[in-house]
Amino acid sequence: MAFPTTSAQQAETNRKILEEIQTKKQLLAGGIINLGLSPANQMPAPQLLGQPTTVNPDFQAGVGIATNATSTARSAFNPTSSTTLGFFIPQDSYFGNSFIPVLPRLEPLPSPATTPTTPNAPPSHNISK
């Protein structure tokens, strides 16, 4: 069972919490804080649009899959890329995805109700009683 705190104690606690939050905000804004991530497992900085991209040397030009990829990834990549309508973009993923599928947008087939009729088509025969 928690004991009720006096308003002075509550105000002091709130002030300390707010000071701590303000300090963390300043550290984050300044880029000084380390979130406990080692350099090996930090995500790369996001690239802004319009900036030139750098090519990862782990990917061979024209081959399409990383040289450090597992044999399972290579064996899945080669037949898949040759038998699909789309193509694959190789990537250096921290999540285990060695390539991203890119599928083309296909126009839907027209339904029979919306198919235009040709002007030279024979008239339909209606039998009336």
UniProtKB/Swiss-Prot annotation:
InterPro entries: SOSSC
GO cellular component, one term: SOSS complex
Pfam families named in the record: SOSSC (PF15925)
GO biological process, one term: DNA repair
Region (Disordered): 105-129
Family indicated by similarity: Belongs to the SOSS-C family.
Name of the protein this chain belongs to: SOSS complex subunit C homolog
